[in-house]
């Protein structure tokens, strides 16, 4: 099956909005063994949009289109698909009623421009939208089918999960087995080099391997077709886990903060945080996870030296002798947070996020991290690159990973 993606919207071409829908769908289709062959971006222009619909549907069995489904003058998708088919737009009464009820709940009357969202090319199958006001639709065009979806990410992804992916899966002669392992802070090139024996193994002929690097994660993926796909995928997984060991922090949809919360909860333990340069980012990452209240005791942003002394008990002489950005102070922050919270674990972070404040001995990007636990305190020093935000985020995720390793 040949699949293409067509996204429309001036905002995507002016840089005002980044298209996150297409990469998400590409990733989901990869799990079905399909690689999207082309992605096309088109402005809100009738001529360009009609031409793009004709071009993509001439090549692909399925074109997934996003955007242009709303109530405004520049929402042109339904109109342009109808023009390509040479059919009129027709009012879809069930969608009108859904819109009326939606507006009624907000105490508003349905306006004529919003009714535009319920007009579709004659013969189209309407796809109800439980996440927003604009339904999607699908209709045969060219050699295959076009599916038109709203561009709002939560709506797009919901409709893909509910309609597009099941539609694709039902038309595949076989669904391959897939695997995904997530590595912490492993460069993509290193992962590729380490994976060469697996990729070059004749037993893995026909297996599609892929990588995705987005700091602090590098994803290693594989899709296995054919007979015994599940068994072959499982054997690859065992080899990958053996190659990377503790650098593997999760699989599939695992996220680092979720795993840390889950491990703490499974042990019945809590953590306390003593943050400086990260300004509460570690606490933010943890509290975004449902159930964090059971494992997070306290989070202190001790930015000034006086606060480090007063709140977390960092000795003044330690600060004077080593400076705020140092291994002893990171250790004291972690131990002070653990003591203040009465928690099993304490995390301490101190660093220079920049852009100023660095010295030849301690350049911008220098960060010291510590994890204090029942068996003592472990510390690490890091030299991060990037702007202020990137340094802080790297440090926050590094702290979570150190805690993950301590909880193993």
UniProtKB/Swiss-Prot annotation:
Gene3D superfamilies: CinA-like, MoaB/Mog-like domain. Coiled coil: none annotated. It comes from the Bacteria. SMART domains: MoCF_biosynth (SM00852). NCBIfam families: cinA_nterm, molyb_syn, PncC_domain. Belongs to the CinA family. HAMAP family: CinA_B. This is CinA-like protein.
């Amino acid at each position: 099956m040949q699949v293409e993606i067509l996204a429309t919207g001036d905002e995507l071409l002016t840089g005002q909005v980044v298209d996150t829908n297409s990469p998400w769908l590409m990733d989901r289709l990869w799990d079905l063994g399909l690689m999207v062959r082309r992605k096309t971006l088109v402005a809100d222009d009738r001529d360009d949009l009609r031409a793009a619909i004709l071009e993509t549907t001439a090549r692909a069995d399925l074109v997934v289109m996003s955007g242009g489904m709303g109530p405004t003058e520049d929402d042109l998708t339904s109109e342009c698909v109808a023009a390509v088919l040479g059919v009129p737009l027709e009012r879809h009464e069930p969608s009108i009623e859904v819109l009326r009820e939606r507006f009624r709940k907000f105490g508003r009357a349905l306006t004529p421009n919003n009714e535009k969202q319920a007009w579709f090319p004659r013969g189209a199958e309407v796809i109800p939208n439980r996440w927003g006001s604009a339904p999607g639709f699908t209709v045969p065009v060219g050699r295959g089918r076009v599916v038109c979806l709203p561009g709002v990410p939560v709506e797009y992804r919901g409709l893909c999960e509910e309609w597009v992916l099941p539609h694709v899966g039902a038309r595949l002669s076989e669904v391959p087995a897939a695997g995904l392992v997530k590595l912490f802070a492993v460069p993509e090139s290193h992962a590729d080099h380490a994976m060469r024996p697996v990729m070059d193994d004749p037993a893995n002929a026909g297996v599609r391997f892929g990588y995705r690097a987005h700091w602090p994660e590098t994803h290693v993926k594989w899709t296995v077709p054919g007979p015994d796909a599940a068994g072959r995928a499982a054997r690859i997984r065992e080899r990958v886990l053996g190659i990377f060991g503790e650098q593997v922090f999760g699989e599939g949809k695992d996220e680092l903060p979720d795993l840390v919360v889950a491990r703490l909860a499974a042990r019945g333990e809590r953590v306390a945080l003593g943050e400086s340069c990260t300004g509460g980012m570690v606490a933010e990452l943890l509290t975004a996870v449902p159930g964090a209240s059971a494992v997070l005791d306290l989070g202190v942003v001790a930015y000034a030296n006086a606060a480090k002394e007063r709140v977390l008990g960092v000795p003044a002489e330690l600060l004077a002798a080593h400076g705020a950005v140092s291994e002893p102070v990171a250790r004291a922050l972690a131990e002070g947070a653990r003591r203040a919270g009465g928690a099993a674990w304490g995390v301490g972070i101190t660093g220079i996020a920049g852009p100023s404040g660095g010295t030849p001995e301690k350049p911008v990007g220098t960060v010291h991290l510590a994890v204090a636990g029942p068996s003592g305190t472990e510390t690490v020093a890091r030299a991060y690159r990037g702007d202020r935000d990137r340094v802080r985020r790297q440090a926050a995720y590094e702290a979570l990973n150190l805690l993950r390793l301590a909880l193993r």
